[in-house]
């Protein structure tokens, strides 16, 4: 997979996409409902940003029944994965990333039917 630095940084320049990427970098895989709950944004807005990241091969999606789960594409070049990891490490205790992590951990019934229905 090929991604250039300009494309990756352009995708990360959007605050919503950056928050999603940090959550996914930290958690490994999340259901759309978990991201929607954590960021407190509408499902269509979340889906639009996820589609953009998926279409640019930064994310991979998989379906389990009616749920769609996203993860960072393991085929990203090492430098791109390192950028995401260093960004997470340097900002995990900074807002809004700290609050996002707390909101996700406080989410009841992750990722059960109650959140994904």
Labelled PLM ranges:
Residues 10, 22, 54, 60, ...:
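A cross-family signal for key residues in well-ordered alpha-helices
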Residues 37, 54-55:
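Alpha-helical residues within the helix-turn-helix
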């Amino acid at each position: 997979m090929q991604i250039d630095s300009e494309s990756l940084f352009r995708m990360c320049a959007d605050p919503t996409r950056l928050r999603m990427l940090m959550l996914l970098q930290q958690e490994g895989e999340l259901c759309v409902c978990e991201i929607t709950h954590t960021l407190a944004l509408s499902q269509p807005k979340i889906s639009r940003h996820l589609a953009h990241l998926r279409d640019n091969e930064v994310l991979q999606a998989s379906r389990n029944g009616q749920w769609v789960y996203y993860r960072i594409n393991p085929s990203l070049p090492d430098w791109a994965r390192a950028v995401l990891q260093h960004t997470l490490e340097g900002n995990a205790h900074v807002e809004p990333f700290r609050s996002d992590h707390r909101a996700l951990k406080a989410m009841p019934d992750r990722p059960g039917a109650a959140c994904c229905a």
